[in-house]
Structure formats: structure tokens, C-alpha cells
Amino acid sequence: DTSKVTDTLIERYFELTLREGNRKAFVDRLKMPKDTITYNNIKHIQQPTLIIWGAQDLLIPVENAYKFQEDLPNNTLIILEGTGHTPMEESPRESLEPVFNFLKTSQ
């Protein structure tokens, strides 16, 4: 959505790729094998957890959000329509309300 992805935002992310080690870290992370042992440990997390996911996330598909919801015992899942991989930047207002509600109710 070009109304959400501004030139300033593109420049910011580009500058992040220029920082020493960032590009290599990103590529290394993509090359890592799937770590199912660590993932399986989330089933033991009892802390209330808020999951906010963009319905149009092209990097990590929304199906993964439902997998987290299934495996994480004490969670609240919010799916934001019309939002991609960075909900807090693409839909800041829509992202903030569930955070406030979660913090109020999970004390």
C-alpha cells in the first residue's frame, strides 16, 4: 500500500541495510534451518502474550499467526486487515489500541 510505505520509511530501511553486520545477519537468518526444538518450548510459556499480525504479511504468512495461537497457551491474537509485515508502522493506530487493551487486562 503506497499510502503506508513512504519514501522516508523506504530510506530508513535502506539505511539499516548499510549498517555494519545488518545485511549479513539478515541473510544468515534466512539460511538458518528451522529450529523446532526452540519453537516447541513456547508451549510452556504461561505469561500472557499478545500476537499482532498483518493479514497481508508476505514475509511470514498469516497462517503462522494461527499456529502461534494454537501452540502458545495464554495468548491474544489480533489480525490486522490491510496490513503487512510491520503492523506498528503500516497501521500504527490499529496496532496501538489492542496493545493498550492487552496491557490493561493482563496485569
Predicted segments, located by residue:
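Conserved alpha/beta-hydrolase "acid-adjacent" motif
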Residues: 58-64
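Short beta-strand/loop motif that positions the catalytic acidic residue
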Residues: 45, 51-53, 57
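Conserved alpha/beta-hydrolase catalytic His-Asp/Glu region
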Residues: 1-44
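Active-site-adjacent alpha-helix of alpha/beta-hydrolase-fold enzymes
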Residues: 66-75
